[in-house]
C-alpha cells in the first residue's frame, strides 16, 4: 500500500496543480511537482483514503472515466509508473514489506527464525553457525538490505538520541539512524519488529560488514524482547553444566575474570560480551548468539543459568557483599541492553530482572584482578550448589 509522505501539500496556482514541499522537505531541498488532472485525482485518493494499492487506484480511475475492464491493465501500468516516480522523489512511501522474492540466508538464533534478504557478502560470517532451514510460517523476522539510499527522509518523533543512534517513531514504523556507521543510510522497522529494511552502501568492505552485523543486533534484540528473551552485557563461562554470567561496568574486568576461570579451573568460555536469557519450561536459560563484542567468543548452544556475579573493584581484597533484594533487581536491569525506548519496554526489562533476582543467585563480588578473585567466586558458587 502506498501513502502520502508528510511535508507535501497540493496547491493550484493559476489553474495548474502543484505538489509543494514544506518544512523538512524544503530543508532537504525537495522540489515541487506539476500534476495533471489524473495525477491530481490519484494524489487526492492516496491522501484522503490513507493509502491505496495500485490495482485499487487503476479500478477507481476506470470507474471515474467510465472505461471498461479491458483498459485496466494499461491503467495499472500508468498508475505504477506514477507511483514509482513519486516514491523515487520521496513524495509517497510504500508500506514496509519485502521487495526481494527469495531470502539470501535463513538463520535461527535462540529459537528466533530470521529470513534475510540482500547480497550475501554483506552478512557477517559470524551468522554462518546459525544458518538453518525452516518453513515460511515459522518466520519471526524478515530483514532486508537495500543497497541504495532511501527515497525520502521523513523521520518522525525522536524517541532516543545519542552519538551511536537516533530512533524515530512513525505511525507504522521506527526509523533508525546510525551516524557513526557511514555505510548505513538508515533503517526502517515495522512496529511489531516482523520486518526490517536497512538502506546501506553495496561495498562489502570489512568495516561495512561489521557495521551491518552490529546494527542487525538492535533489531534482533527488539524481536527477542517480544519473544521473552533479554540481553545482559556480561561475559559467561560454563561451570558444572550451567552458564554463569559475570557483569560489571566497562573496565570492571569481566573478561579478566572469565579468563581466570578458564586458566585456573578449565571452565569453557560461552560468550565474551553479551548473553541472551529467557525462560523455558519454568527454567531460566542462556542462549547462544553471534554477538560477542570484540572477544570473538560465542556459542550456538543453550545452557541452564547458574547465576549472575556482579563485579566491583577493590584494590586489595576479594570478598562478597550482600545486596538488598531491590538492589539486585535494579543492578541486573541496568546491565541489560534490551530496548527501553518506551515505558512498556522498560517494564518488561524490569519484570524479567525481578524474575532472575527472585529465582537465581545474584552475587556482588568486590575483587582484585588476581587469581584469588576467581577462587573467591568459585567457593561462593560451590557453597550455593552444596545448599541445593
State each model region's role.
Residues 3-26, 39, 62, 66-76, ...:
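A noncatalytic interaction/capping subdomain that flanks phosphate/NTP-handling catalytic cores
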Residues 27-33:
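A structural micro-motif at secondary-structure boundaries
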Residues 45-56:
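Short capping segments at the starts of secondary-structure elements
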Residues 57-61:
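Short, well-structured alpha-helical segments that form the helix of a local strand-helix-strand
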Residues 252-254:
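Conserved glycine(s) of the Walker
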Residues 257:
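Hydrophobic positions on the alpha1 helix immediately C-terminal to the Walker A/P-loop
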Amino acid at each position: 500500500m502506498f501513502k502520502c509522505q508528510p511535508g507535501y501539500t497540493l496547491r493550484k496556482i493559476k489553474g495548474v496543480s502543484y505538489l509543494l514541499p514544506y518544512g523538512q522537505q524544503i530543508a532537504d531541498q525537495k522540489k515541487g511537482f506539476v500534476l495533471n488532472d489524473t495525477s491530481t485525482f490519484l494524489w487526492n485518493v492516496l491522501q484522503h483514503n490513507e493509502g491505496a494499492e495500485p490495482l485499487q487506484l487503476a479500478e477507481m480511475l476506470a470507474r471515474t472515466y467510465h472505461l471498461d475492464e479491458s483498459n485496466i491493465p494499461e491503467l495499472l501500468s500508468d498508475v505504477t509508473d506514477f507511483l514509482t516516480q513519486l516514491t523515487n522523489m520521496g513524495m509517497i512511501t510504500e508500506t514496509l514489506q519485502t521487495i526481494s522474492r527469495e531470502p539470501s540466508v535463513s538463520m535461527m538464533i535462540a529459537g528466533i527464525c530470521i529470513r534475510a534478504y540482500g547480497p550475501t557478502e554483506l552478512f557477517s560470517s559470524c551468522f554462518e553457525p546459525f544458518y538453518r532451514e525452516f518453513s515460511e510460517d515459522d518466520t519471526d523476522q524478515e530483514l532486508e538490505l537495500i543497497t541504495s539510499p532511501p527515497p525520502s527522509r521523513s523521520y518522525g518523533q525522536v524517541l532516543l538520541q545519542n552519538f551511536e543512534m537516533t530512533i524515530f517513531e512513525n505511525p507504522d514504523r521506527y526509523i533508525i539512524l546510525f551516524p557513526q556507521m557511514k555505510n548505513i543510510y538508515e533503517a526502517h522497522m515495522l512496529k511489531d519488529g516482523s520486518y526490517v529494511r536497512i538502506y546501506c552502501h553495496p561495498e562489502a568492505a570489512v568495516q561495512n560488514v561489521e557495521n551491518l552485523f552490529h546494527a542487525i543486533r538492535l533489531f534482533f534484540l527488539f524481536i527477542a524482547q517480544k519473544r521473552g528473551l533479554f540481553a545482559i552485557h556480561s561475559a559467561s563461562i560454563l561451570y558444572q553444566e550451567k552458564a554463569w554470567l559475570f557483569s560489571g561496568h566497562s573496565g570492571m574486568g569481566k573478561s579478566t575474570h572469565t579468563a581466570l576461570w578458564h586458566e585456573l579451573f578449565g571452565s569453557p568460555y560461552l560468550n565474551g560480551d553479551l548473553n541472551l536469557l529467557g525462560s523455558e519450561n519454568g527454567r531460566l536459560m542462556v542462549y547462544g548468539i553471534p554477538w560477542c563484542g570484540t572477544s570473538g567468543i560465542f556459542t550456538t548452544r543453550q545452557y541452564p543459568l547458574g547465576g549472575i556475579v556482579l563485579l566491583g573493584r577493590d584494590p586489595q581484597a576479594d570478598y562478597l557483599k550482600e545486596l538488598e533484594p531491590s538492589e539486585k533487581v535494579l543492578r541486573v536491569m541496568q546491565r541489560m541492553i534490551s530496548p527501553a525506548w518506551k515505558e512498556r519496554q522498560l517494564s518488561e526489562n524490569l519484570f524479567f530482572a525481578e524474575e532472575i533476582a527472585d529465582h537465581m543467585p545474584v552475587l556482588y563480588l568486590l575483587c582484585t584482578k588476581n587469581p584469588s578473585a576467581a577462587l573467591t567466586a568459585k567457593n561462593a558458587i560451590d557453597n550455593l550448589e552444596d545448599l541445593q
